[in-house]
Structure formats: structure tokens, C-alpha cells
């Protein structure tokens, strides 16, 4: 049976095996998908041994996306620009192909919500690894992006890297342009730890819809809770993005595109 896995550390919290096995059942694909704990010191050796043992592909989650990318022989454009991958596929010639389906997963989920239309203004909060993976597909969907980060230089470096692909400008968190935004996307770790609000409430009130790339089982993420406390109710967490990026990884491996919305509805 074809073997796939998700690699991360920690990994017990991962929903990927549940999601991928639902996608396989829906599309009548015979495969096994498991969770694997990556060793912080010897991840590269583990991953190469996994593929040498006959595995067909895997997903990569924190903190290994950049390290896995370095092991690949060939890359999609979106993985190359992100310098990170969440998906590896073993090609027929034995080479490893790296892709990053995070951004197309986000775009697909925004389409599910009917929040994505050409030539919108999108405000992204945070310029870390999560953001790197989503910028190209958003720009390819003809979105105008303001990328805000506490450290302006980090936002500026990322915006400059992606400027050839569309309209993107950098801002610091306290110099965000005062204009309306069709979607505000939280890509900071505020969703994980609680912590302080990533941005001033007055900026949030300029938004029409609010998307958190994090998700929390059975409760609101801190960012979603903050939005609701301000009376901003057009909100979504990132669980749909998680299912959609999984569906795009599945499509790369199996050549079949599942109905991700059906699986999302089952699991949410």
C-alpha cells in the first residue's frame, strides 16, 4: 500500500492523518497516511530514510518546512519563492519534488467563503514563514496586498521579493495605511499563544472580513475572539485552509482532486 505521512515536532496534535484518510476514502484511493515525529537533530536523515523505504510522499509542518525544502531536487515556483515546502512527492526517477500548498489552500478557502474577488485590498498581519507561503497565490488571484509586520525591515524584504508578481507594499504595524480592506488576514502567532493583539483595534475596524490562519478546536482563536469583541462578526479561522491545502497535496500525489468542502463540513 502506498505510504504517506506528515512530519513535524510536536506532531500528536496534527489533524493531517484524519483529513488525508477522509480524502482517500472519498476518492476511493488505497493509501496509508500516518504522523511521524521528526527529530530536531536528525530530521534530514529520517526523511531520506522514509523515502528510501518506499514512501510516495509526505506533508511537512512546523518546524521543518525550510529544512525539507533544502532536501528537494525540484521545486514548484511557489515553494521556491517561499523557500519552504509543506509537501514532498517522490517522482518516478527517485527525485524529490517540493511544493507549497499553503497559499493555494488559503485561496481555495477564501473562495469557499466567497471572500475572494479580483482587485481587492487585503491586509496581512505578520511577515513570518506562514506569510511567505501564501503571498504568490494571493497575488496570482489579483489581490492588492498590504503586508504589515512589527519589524518593518522584515515586511519590506518580503514585499520586495514578491513585487514582480503583483501589487504588494510593506508597512509597520503602527503605520498601516488608513483605508478599507476587503479581508484582514492574521498570520501572526497571536493565534497560538493568546498574547497581545497584533494590531490596533481602529485598524481592524477598517476591514470587512477577518481570517485567522490559525485554528482552535471547539473555540475561537484569540484573534477571532478579539474581532468578535469589537463587533466584527464576518470571521473565519484557518481550519478550512488546513483541509484545502491537504486536498491540494493529495491532488499532487494521487492525480485526483477531492471535494474539500465535503470533508471540511464533516470535520468542522
UniProtKB/Swiss-Prot annotation:
Cellular-component GO terms for this entry: cytosol
Pathway(s) the chain acts in: Metabolic intermediate biosynthesis; chorismate biosynthesis; chorismate from D-erythrose 4-phosphate and phosphoenolpyruvate: step 4/7
GO BP, one annotated term: chorismate biosynthetic process
Top-rank taxon, per record: Bacteria
Residues the entry annotates as binding NADP(+): 126-130, 149-154, 213, 238
Keyword Amino-acid biosynthesis: yes
Entry EC number(s): 1.1.1.25
Keyword annotations: Amino-acid biosynthesis, Aromatic amino acid biosynthesis, NADP, Oxidoreductase
Record-listed shikimate binding positions: 14-16, 61, 86, 102, 215
Keyword Transferase attributed: no
Substrates-to-products reaction catalysed: shikimate + NADP(+) = 3-dehydroshikimate + NADPH + H(+)
One of the record's GO molecular function terms: shikimate 3-dehydrogenase (NADP+) activity
Uppermost EC category: oxidoreductase
Cited function: Involved in the biosynthesis of the chorismate, which leads to the biosynthesis of aromatic amino acids. Catalyzes the reversible NADPH linked reduction of 3-dehydroshikimate (DHSA) to yield shikimate (SA).
Family statement drawn from the similarity comment of this UniProt entry: Belongs to the shikimate dehydrogenase family.
Assembly and interaction partners: Homodimer.
Protein name: Shikimate dehydrogenase (NADP(+))
Gene symbol of the encoding locus: aroE
Amino acid at each position: 500500500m502506498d505510504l504517506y505521512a506528515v512530519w513535524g515536532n510536536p506532531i500528536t496534535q496534527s489533524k493531517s492523518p484524519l483529513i488525508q484518510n477522509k480524502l482517500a476514502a472519498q476518492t476511493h484511493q488505497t493509501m496509508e497516511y500516518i504522523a511521524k515525529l521528526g527529530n530536531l537533530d536528525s530530521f534530514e536523515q529520517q526523511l531520506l530514510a522514509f523515502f528510501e523505504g518506499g514512501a510516495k510522499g509526505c506533508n511537512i509542518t512546523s518546524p521543518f518546512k525550510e529544512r525539507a525544502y533544502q532536501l528537494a531536487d525540484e521545486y514548484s515556483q511557489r515553494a521556491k519563492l517561499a523557500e519552504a515546502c509543506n509537501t514532498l512527492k517522490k517522482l518516478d526517477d527517485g527525485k524529490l519534488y517540493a511544493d507549497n500548498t499553503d497559499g493555494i489552500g488559503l485561496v481555495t478557502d477564501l473562495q469557499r467563503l466567497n471572500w475572494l474577488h479580483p482587485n481587492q485590498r487585503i491586509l496581512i498581519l505578520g511577515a513570518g514563514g506562514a506569510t511567505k507561503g501564501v503571498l504568490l497565490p494571493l497575488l496570482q488571484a489579483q489581490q492588492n496586498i498590504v503586508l504589515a509586520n512589527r519589524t518593518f525591515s522584515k515586511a519590506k524584504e518580503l514585499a520586495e521579493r514578491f513585487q514582480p508578481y503583483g501589487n504588494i507594499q510593506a508597512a509597520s504595524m503602527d503605520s498601516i495605511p488608513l483605508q478599507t480592506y476587503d479581508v484582514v488576514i492574521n498570520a501572526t502567532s497571536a493565534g497560538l499563544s493568546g498574547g497581545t493583539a497584533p494590531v490596533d483595534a481602529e485598524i481592524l475596524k477598517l476591514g470587512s472580513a477577518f481570517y485567522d490562519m490559525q485554528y482552535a478546536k471547539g473555540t475561537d482563536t484569540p484573534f477571532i475572539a478579539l474581532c468578535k469583541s469589537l463587533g466584527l462578526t464576518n470571521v473565519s479561522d484557518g481550519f478550512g485552509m488546513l483541509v484545502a491545502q491537504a486536498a491540494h497535496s493529495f491532488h499532487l500525489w494521487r492525480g485526483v482532486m477531492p471535494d474539500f468542502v465535503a470533508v471540511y463540513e464533516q470535520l468542522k
